[in-house]
Amino acid sequence: MRTIEGFKLRKLGNEFILVGESMSLINFNKMITFNETAAFLWEQAQKMSVETGRFTAEALCDALRAEYEVMPEQAMSDVESTIASWREAEIIEA
């Protein structure tokens, strides 16, 4: 998987908002907000996409476990749920 280019993560109060930088990426009917953990995962996914051209659920799980004290099963569950929401929002590609 890889993130779609052209999105920037912005912090607004206690939440993070994903903003499309070009008019073709902007959908005025929905706003994509992340909590701190999802924002961390997005930043990792973007970094991996730039560096290697892709990211995997396993790599995000490893990054999540390195950053936060979370059990492997919970980390993978959180990552899979987050990736599913990104697919639904159409901000990643297979």
Which sequence ranges carry the predicted segments?
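Long, charge-rich, low-complexity alpha-helical segments
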Residues: 30-94
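Acidic, low-complexity/disordered tracts enriched in E/D and polar residues
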Residues: 1-44
